[in-house]
Amino acid sequence: GKNYQACCPFHTEKSPSFSVSPDKQFYHCFGCGEHGNAISFLMEFDRLEFPDAIEELASFYSMDVPREQTHQTPAQLKQQHQAYQQKQNDYELMANISRFFQQQLKVASDKQVAIDYLKGRGLSGQIAKNFGIGYISDQWDGMMKVFGQSAETRQQLIDLGMAIQGERNQPYDRFRGRIMFPIHDKRGRVIGFGGRVLGDGTPKYLNSPETRIYHKGQELYGLFEAKQANKQLQQLVVVEGYMEVV
């Protein structure tokens, strides 16, 4: 037929009652009554505000969201587009790095010390997965070997605070021998990391610096995860560290 059927993502069911109509551009669940279009779906399912849902849809199709006319010159418009594209590349790279850290928690030769620490703090594998928690071994360039293959990407890693420029123009990993906590913005994009050292090293916690996509004063660790768990979030309890949030 013209419509797609699936189990509803908004309530638990065994028989598909969720219908999507490409022609009419809306969805409807005959079980719970949820109804809307692509924008309202993102707002409900991903817990996004209206402007963020618009931005998310636009980025999916590699489109710029039109802004209020400000009489910009062609050069200014070009610069604005380049800045937008750069940030999209940044988000993609940070997401890949986050997946790499999560994989290292499963395959690194010294993974057990990280797993034992997390278990000792009462975290199950599912909780670690829900928060995207990962691990990076205590190596000089464990992450750089994977992602720093080109001069352009090496500079991008430095700009994003994932690498530090060393002597003889050789960047090295900022985070080494640490449990890694990805920091998400309100749209769920990875914008930075917090790393908890294993052992007696210092500092105990190492955080991403300010970058073009990460502004510490504007972000709250765990807010995205909290909104995913409860779309009618009424209040928050502010605690000190990453582990306390988890």
Task: Please place each PLM-identified region on the residue numbering.
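Non-catalytic accessory segments of DNA primases and related replication-initiation nucleases
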Residues: G1-Q155, D159, S208
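Phosphate-handling DNA/RNA-contact segment within nucleic-acid enzymes
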Residues: A75-I97, D116, S137-V246
